Structure formats: structure tokens, C-alpha cells
């Protein structure tokens, strides 16, 4: 089992963790239906960029 040789300070630990923060998902509202969806993704009812692209 690995054991550290020297103690890492709180500052070093927190500097390492500075890149671990989560970001929120970019959500858009469709022009025609007003439905929220992820950016660059088709909505649940098949619209993309205001056009119907998938027929159910």
C-alpha cells in the first residue's frame, strides 16, 4: 500500500482540487415549442434549431 513520504499542506491539497469543480449543463429553450433542452441536442419532441427533424 502506498504511503506518503511528506504531509501535503491544505494549500497544496486545495490547489490540486481547484480543477475539480463541476459546471452546470448549458440549457437552451427551443424557439418553436418553448421546451428546454441541452445545447446542440434534439428536443424530446424531435425539434432542432426550430425545425422538425425526427418524425415519431
Swiss-Prot record:
InterPro entries: Ribosomal_bL32, Ribosomal_bL32_bact, Ribosomal_zn-bd. GO terms for molecular function: structural constituent of ribosome. Keywords: Ribonucleoprotein, Ribosomal protein. GO terms for biological process: translation. Residues 7-16 have a biased composition (Basic residues). SUPFAM superfamilies: Zn-binding ribosomal proteins. Residues 1-27 are annotated as: Disordered. GO terms for cellular component: large ribosomal subunit. The keyword Ribonucleoprotein applies. The keyword Transmembrane does not apply. Belongs to the bacterial ribosomal protein bL32 family. This is Large ribosomal subunit protein bL32. It comes from Actinobacillus pleuropneumoniae serotype 7 (strain AP76).
Amino acid at each position: 500500500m502506498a504511503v506518503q513520504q511528506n504531509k501535503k499542506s491544505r494549500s497544496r491539497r486545495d490547489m490540486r482540487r481547484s480543477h475539480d469543480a463541476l459546471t452546470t449543463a448549458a440549457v437552451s429553450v427551443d424557439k418553436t415549442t418553448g421546451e428546454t433542452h441541452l445545447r446542440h441536442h434534439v428536443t424530446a419532441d424531435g425539434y432542432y434549431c426550430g425545425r422538425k427533424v425526427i418524425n415519431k
